[in-house]
């Protein structure tokens, strides 16, 4: 299903490929990425740019259709029957306005024939923990627990899915990295940035 944009509760937004921007627009997308994720969870941005040259990898801006301003970014990898949402972020100036919820709901509509997977840092048992609030946000917006937890470079992660009955396999997780690019050098860097061996935990 091809959709140019989406509208929900008075909010209207659309997407635009990173490669379609001039240097100023590209810098805005990079800044949102760099300021939205901890260093331990990020690839160097140039790797995202190179990987986005693949047909199955999408590095996009998220645009407020009413103002034509860049308000966020997303990085999505498609393989098999999975769309892996590696990164999605709304600029801090535009958070708590409904854009994040709209992005997730729209992605689920766009990827109706696939399971959207994403991972979050595993929450603690404290309800006020920011990680727990982040998880609750995804659960409120049509994502489900999968019971899949891994440890990578000393950080524990939990995987969520847009498909309620999705069973995540080791192969599913390995492919989220191996399908990012066909470039041997970048594959090597990716492999050495995050652990390519899947360490499942309880």
Stretches with model-predicted labels:
Residues 4-46, 171-176, 188-195:
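Short amphipathic alpha-helix that is part of the acyltransferase structural core
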Residues 61, 68-77, 82-89:
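Conserved beta-strand in the GNAT
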Residues 34-66:
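Active-site rim helix/loop that mediates acceptor-substrate recognition in acyltransferases
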Residues 90, 96-110:
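Conserved acetyl-CoA-binding loop-helix of GNAT-fold acetyltransferases
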Residues 111-129:
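Conserved GNAT acetyl-CoA-binding A-motif
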Residues 88-95, 122-124:
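A short, internal acetyl-CoA/4′-phosphopantetheine-binding micro-motif in the GNAT/acyltransferase core
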Residues 119, 133-135, 139-158:
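Conserved catalytic-core motifs of GNAT/GCN5-like acyltransferases
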Residues 131, 151-202:
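C-terminal "cap" of GNAT-fold acetyltransferases
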